[in-house]
Regions:
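Sec-dependent bacterial lipoprotein signal peptides
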Residues: 1-23
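Extracellular/secretory-pathway and virion-surface proteins
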Residues: 25-537
Length: 537
């Protein structure tokens, strides 16, 4: 966010000092040295509310009042939640039914079987299935002393080329030395009618399997020890479209959490909001009715360990979600929304907890009224059920020590043994047009985030002056100072990082103050430093 860049100037004071005061080349060790006092302007910058929060979150009304608008997904359920087509194999065996041998002529169709294959899809009762991905493997295990041609015909299926069958062959084999072959068919785009041969079943595919001796061969003597095994293997099936009855069951979502980045830069302090709105939206891309029972929606602040549960009538009863509309080549999802605000909930307390996570738990009832579509539930590969949150927070607020924090590593010239900066005083000239005072802190921390030392900052940036309408009518000027001792400079050069914090407090703690897009703070930073000339050896 932009605030990292602007408040980063504060964090980089010391690094910038050293950069500006560094002299070019290393001096000879016998050169004379002397110290001088220098006054150097370092930084001049300005920032608005768009530099304190991500610009993409900021909207304004015609009066310039700032509103934060944050959108986030709460949860999402996709196709594999409702339909998972497992790998499935069907095996067919032929053996001579008598303890004798028979001489079959070339081209003889010695094995033929009509069958219905039933797929195990648990609660789902599908009538139509169109595949996006998948393959069909026809495997043959031959112990007959002739090349054998095997055929798998699927009257209930239509391949993309319009065909319904696949054929493969396997070389001659014997009981002691069988031969094998595998043919593979890409099933992408294949449509299956799963109503069976009488069109009154579900999850059922009509199948015909056959095998004949090579028409160009010599025929074969077949004994009771000879056999042929054919297997049809459906692998890696991913539906593009499915229609049927998807069952009546409950799917649990959560308990789980999602990250919330709205308050990422805030580490402490309190926030009191005048108004806030949360819009809960649900989009159903599945062709079945849903009933949602919200169990919990929580604002979790992992920094403080505090959790605030949202209270609203939405938790008292089910939410009924209509099914999507099937267009034949796509779908129109159904939409649901509910507006939660300070008049019907504790949304203000929910957000004032400054959450960095949202916790949720809910139950999804599929087809709560049963098969009211008469087996016409549907889904597409692109179907999903998703719930989202839209937070709208007009910046009419009271803050007390609401603290932004950044950590940075200064890019210092030279090294701990070869720098010439001895000490200095930083001055920050602030012209503040916000209705909030700003208190600055600078800490030196180690690689683990533990504080080593503090750079003391004296003074605060006073809040702008309020008029009768509680808007800033005049900006105020303040001067802050920070002493950089020789010890602090040495700590910086020893590898410490800078943690800068800015704590904002509204000037009126009894009324919610509006933040306008036009409010601005101007900053100028100067350095009065003691520098050892020829001392950077």
């Amino acid at each position: 966010m932009k605030n990292v860049r602007h408040w980063g100037w504060v964090a980089f004071w010391t690094g910038t000092i050293c950069s500006l005061l560094s002299v070019g080349c290393r001096k000879e060790s016998d050169r004379p040295t002397w110290d001088v006092d220098l006054l150097v302007p370092l930084v001049r910058t300005s920032f608005t509310i768009r530099d304190l929060v991500a610009d993409s979150l900021v909207t304004t009304d015609p009066q310039g009042t700032v509103t934060l608008l944050y959108r986030s997904d709460l949860f999402k359920l996709e196709l594999d939640t409702l339909l998972l087509a497992p790998d499935t194999s069907f095996t067919y065996r032929y053996a001579l039914p008598i303890a004798d041998s028979l001489n079959f002529p070339a081209g003889f169709n010695f094995f033929s079987q009509n069958d219905v294959q039933r797929f195990d899809l648990e609660e789902l009762a599908l009538r139509t299935l169109v595949l996006r991905e998948g393959r069909l493997e026809l495997r043959m295990d031959n112990r007959v002393n002739s090349l054998v041609i095997g055929t798998l015909d699927l009257p209930g299926a239509i391949f993309p080329n319009g065909g319904t069958s696949m054929t493969t062959s396997v070389g001659a084999g014997t009981p002691s030395n069988p031969t094998y072959s595998t043919a593979v068919r890409d099933l992408a785009g294949t449509s299956f009618d799963l109503r069976g041969p009488q069109f009154n079943a579900v999850n059922t595919l009509e199948t015909s399997i056959g095998a004949m001796l090579d028409p160009a061969g010599q025929g074969a003597w077949v004994t009771a020890d000879d056999s042929l095994v054919l297997s049809a293997n459906y692998l890696g099936l991913v539906p593009q479209y499915a229609r049927g009855y998807f069952g009546q069951r409950t799917v649990e979502a959560g308990p789980d959490t999602n990250d919330l980045s709205l308050f990422d830069a805030l580490v402490s302090g309190t926030l009191d909001l005048d108004v806030a709105t949360l819009r809960l939206t649900v989009e159903n891309g599945f062709g079945l009715d849903l009933q949602v029972r919200m169990r919990q929606l929580s604002a979790i602040n992992t920094r403080t360990g505090n959790t605030v549960d949202l209270t609203h009538t939405i938790f008292q009863g089910p939410i009924n979600i209509n099914r999507a509309i099937d267009l034949g080549s796509g779908f129109i999802p159904s939409q649901y929304s509910n507006t939660i605000d300070v008049s019907n909930s504790n949304i203000d307390l929910f957000l004032e907890n400054l959450p960095d996570q949202i916790g949720y738990e809910l139950d999804l009832g599929l087809n709560p009224l049963g098969d009211i579509s008469s087996g016409n539930d549907f889904l597409y590969y692109e179907s999903e059920l998703k719930a989202g949150l839209e937070l709208e927070v007009p910046l009419r607020l009271i803050t007390n020590e609401l603290t932004l924090q950044t950590v940075s590593t200064p890019d210092l010239p030279r090294n701990a043994e070869g720098h010439a900066l001895r000490s200095g005083e930083l001055k920050l000239f602030a012209t503040n047009g916000f209705p909030m005072s700003a208190r600055f802190e600078l800490d030196l921390i180690d690689a683990n985030g533990e504080m080593i030392a503090t750079i003391p900052v004296d003074g605060i940036a006073a809040a702008g002056l309020l008029g009768a309408n509680n808007l800033v009518t005049a900006r105020t000027e303040s001067v802050l100072t920070a002493e950089l001792s020789e010890e602090l400079v040495n700590i910086l050069y020893a590898g410490a990082r800078l943690r800068s914090s800015v704590a904002f407090t509204t000037s009126d703690q009894s009324q919610h103050l509006r933040i306008l897009d036009s409010y601005r703070m101007d900053l100028q930073i100067t350095l009065a430093a003691n520098y050892m000339v020829n001392g950077d050896e």
